[in-house]
Amino acid sequence: GLTQKDLVALSGAHTIGKAR
């Protein structure tokens, strides 16, 4: 399931991908 931790991790990974 998606916990707040998972959402933060996904959000962070997405942001890093966009930055690159």
Swiss-Prot record:
One of its GO terms (molecular function) is heme binding. It is found in: Secreted. It comes from the Eukaryota. One of its GO terms (biological process) is hydrogen peroxide catabolic process. Keywords: Calcium, Heme, Hydrogen peroxide, Iron, Metal-binding, Oxidoreductase, Peroxidase, Secreted. Its EC number is 1.11.1.7. Its cofactor is Ca(2+); heme b. GO terms for cellular component: extracellular region. InterPro entries: Haem_peroxidase (IPR002016), Haem_peroxidase_sf (IPR010255), Peroxidases_heam-ligand_BS (IPR019793). The keyword Metal-binding applies. It catalyses: 2 a phenolic donor + H2O2 = 2 a phenolic radical donor + 2 H2O. Binds 2 calcium ions per subunit. Binds 1 heme b (iron(II)-protoporphyrin IX) group per subunit. Ca(2+) binds at residue 15. Heme binds at residue 14. Belongs to the peroxidase family. Classical plant (class III) peroxidase subfamily. Removal of H(2)O(2), oxidation of toxic reductants, biosynthesis and degradation of lignin, suberization, auxin catabolism, response to environmental stresses such as wounding, pathogen attack and oxidative stress. These functions might be dependent on each isozyme/isoform in each plant tissue. This is Peroxidase 1.
